[in-house]
């Protein structure tokens, strides 16, 4: 009986919570800057949840119980993603303290040759970002070092910054440790590794084209900065016991991913293996983390668990290395988890009120073909990056807005999750007032509009997504009425 009393909100009324969200986010970003994710954005989401709920109860006759149930259902839907994020925090700490990431960086530095500096720069940042799951950490650490090397070799700052950002966001996009990757998959209800594998179809071609461009651009530069590279590598070697044996963990992790082992199991095994290697290869670092005078069993146990759950700082004598080996642990994931929960509250209120359905119905009228649907998703993601100034909010809104549309059109959720990352994750750094754009410009000392033309990976990815949609490669359409599968 209650369902008959509910009224479908008009698209205009449905826009009100979105407009309030954009306005409050604008003020929040201007006020808190890159610290907006530490609480400001979460408060904004809860505030707009209240606005959407009030409008639903007053104008649409929706009962609070229905809204509450929708919110709880949304939060329950991301419970696995939250556990994954906690494990990612533990894994990032264990990979750092065990020396896995430093070993990858150490050997990665050896491949730099002046003639191929830009391409090597992009590859190194990509590897580090894949292993850490953070473009911000990569740019703030190895990126700064590479900026110095690039400037010493006479490269324009825009080119070097473009190579660093292209590589860093390649890793941020496909790493199972990346919070944006986990967020995009959870919002669209796509299994994490299925999402990552499907992204490879657009990400790898985009990266290949990017590397070709950077390789050609680097041919004219032949100056040698081997001294600086050797100094950085030496600092890594002095702080960690660098060993190729440590690379067993990434190899095993890759095999587990290829075998489609569930994310939680893969992350747990990888974390446990890294923890064991940390005790064997880096006992001195575990002792330092524990603040103990002797590397006994108790201090090793304490140091290892502290890297799992808390923030870890290692004094290497090198400022860049200190930042690189600083792991956030599980505690470092709390802002993202908090954001996801608040976003699910907002999404639940928009769903229960019918506002999300009202907005998506407008989009549905104009999307008659697959290419138009994907292109609309891409441009919507870019638009949200511009107006919300935050990639996390943009991922959440894009996923929620188009989720039902893709389902009604019969397309797999992984197409939406891939398109969302192809548009939102990589373009956030290209917007000067976006938290990503502001942060990276500040860290690298290069204005956003200066490096924008050289972020080839970030510029190519959205276009590649649309191109793949036009070709129809590996895109399946399912029609519920006849249970048929059409491979486009």
Roles of regions detected by a PLM:
Residues 1-85, 201-211, 218-342, 483-488:
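Hydrophobic transmembrane alpha-helices of multi-pass small-molecule transporters
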Residues 57-60, 150-157, 174-178, 277-288, ...:
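Juxtamembrane membrane-interface segments at transmembrane alpha-helix termini
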Residues 111-205, 380-422, 486-487:
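Hydrophobic transmembrane alpha-helices that form the pore/transport pathway of multi-pass ion
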Residues 173-176, 181-234, 245, 394, ...:
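Juxtamembrane and boundary regions of transmembrane helices in multi-pass small-molecule transporters
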Residues 80-167, 181, 201-207, 211-219, ...:
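Early transmembrane hairpin of solute transport permeases
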Residues 21, 44, 48, 52, ...:
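Alpha-helical transmembrane segments in multi-pass membrane proteins
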Residues 11-14, 18, 123-134, 244-252, ...:
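Alpha-helical transmembrane segments and their immediate juxtamembrane interface regions
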Residues 60-151, 309-403:
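Membrane-embedded alpha-helical segments and adjacent helix-loop junctions characteristic
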């Amino acid at each position: 009986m209650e369902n008959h009393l509910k009224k479908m909100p008009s698209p205009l009324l449905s826009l009100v919570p979105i407009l309030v969200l954009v306005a409050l986010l604008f003020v929040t970003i201007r006020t808190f800057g890159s610290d907006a994710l530490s609480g400001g954005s979460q408060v904004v989401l809860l505030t707009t949840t209240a606005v959407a709920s009030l409008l639903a109860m007053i104008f649409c006759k929706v009962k609070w119980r229905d809204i509450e149930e929708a919110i709880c259902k949304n939060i329950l839907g991301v419970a696995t993603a939250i556990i994954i994020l906690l494990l990612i925090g533990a894994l990032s700490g264990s990979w750092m303290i065990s020396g896995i990431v430093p070993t990858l960086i150490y050997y990665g530095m050896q491949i730099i040759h002046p003639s191929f500096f830009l391409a090597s720069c992009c590859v190194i940042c990509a590897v580090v970002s894949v292993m850490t799951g953070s473009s911000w950490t990569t740019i703030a650490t190895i990126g700064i070092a590479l900026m110095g090397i690039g400037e010493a070799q006479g490269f324009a700052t825009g080119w070097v910054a473009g190579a660093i950002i292209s590589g860093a966001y390649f890793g941020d996009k496909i790493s199972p440790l990346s919070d944006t990757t986990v967020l995009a998959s959870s919002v669209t209800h796509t299994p994490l590794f299925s999402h990552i594998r499907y992204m490879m179809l657009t990400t790898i071609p985009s990266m290949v084209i990017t590397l070709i461009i950077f390789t050609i651009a680097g041919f004219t530069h032949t100056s040698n900065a081997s001294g600086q590279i050797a100094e950085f590598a030496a600092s890594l070697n002095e702080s960690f016991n660098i060993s190729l044996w440590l690379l067993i963990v990434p190899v095993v992790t890759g095999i587990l991913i290829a075998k489609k082992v569930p994310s939680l199991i893969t992350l747990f095994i990888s974390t446990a293996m890294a923890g064991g290697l940390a005790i064997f290869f880096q006992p001195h670092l575990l002792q330092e983390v524990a603040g103990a005078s002797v590397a006994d069993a108790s201090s090793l146990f304490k140091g290892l668990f502290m890297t799992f759950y808390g923030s870890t700082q290692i004094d290497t004598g090198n400022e860049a290395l200190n930042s690189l080996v600083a792991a956030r642990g599980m505690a470092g994931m709390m802002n993202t988890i908090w954001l996801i929960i608040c976003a699910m509250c907002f999404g639940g209120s928009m769903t229960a009120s019918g506002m999300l359905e009202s907005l998506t119905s407008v989009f549905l009228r104009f999307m008659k073909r697959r290419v138009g649907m994907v292109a609309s998703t891409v441009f919507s993601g870019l638009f949200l990056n511009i107006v919300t100034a935050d990639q996390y909010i943009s991922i959440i809104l894009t996923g929620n807005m188009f989720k039902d549309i893709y389902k009604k059109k019969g397309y797999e959720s992984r197409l939406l999750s891939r398109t969302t990352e192809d548009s939102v994750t990589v373009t956030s750094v290209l917007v000067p007032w976006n938290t990503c754009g502001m942060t990276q410009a500040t860290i690298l000392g290069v204005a956003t509009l200066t490096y924008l033309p050289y972020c080839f990976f970030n510029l190519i990815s959205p276009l590649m997504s649309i191109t793949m949609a036009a070709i129809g490669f590996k895109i399946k359409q399912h029609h519920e009425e006849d249970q048929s599968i059409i491979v486009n």
